[in-house]
Amino acid sequence: MSLIQVSNLTFGYEGSFDNVFENASFSMDTNWRCGFIGRNGRGKTTFLNLLLGKYAYSGTISASVNFEYFPFEVENPDDTPLEIAESIMPDFEMWRLTRELNLLDADPGLLYRPYSTLSYGERTKVLLSILFIRENSFLLIDEPTNHLDIEARGTLAQYLKSKKGFILVSHDRAFLDEVIDHVLSINRADITVMRGNFTTWQQEKDREDQFELQQNEKLKK
């Protein structure tokens, strides 16, 4: 168990009048299953890219884990998933990868087929299996339910509930409710952390919005 510490994070795109983040500070445990919430265009993808070191920023992000993004780009789609795993982790243990696929209700035979021939749902399961056997990793999981039917979403939810250490971005609120135990939410140019799932966060937000509305009404009188 360790902490990911974000201190005074400030970032804005060149030419933009407003910063995406302004002195954002918070910490999260590397064992948490975090849902990342915010309206489209508010900075979710930007923050993931900052964790991945893709942009320069002011402030600090300190962590003892390696951030891994899903879905990661496969350089040669004609490679098999087994070859993809070997290129990333030359010394990985085959039984561990097979175990992950079984937990996702996926045929381990997928490992021997060209990646380009797999369905999008099969690709999702293969890539997640590879990432979750990497040592000392904290996953940044971006919309994993795309291309999955209801049954596969349920299987994936149960799978992720058994894991620790990730940030999950998903527009599927029921999926978030099932999986996460903490919420990261973007509030203007800051990020706040709360224990609970999406419903817990929404209830708290509704209370805060109602309180703010009442205060504004009092000021008008």
Q: Which residues does each PLM region occupy?
A:
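ABC ATP-binding cassette signature C-motif
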Residues: M1-N216
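Short cytosolic helices in intracellular loops of multi-pass membrane proteins
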Residues: K218-K221
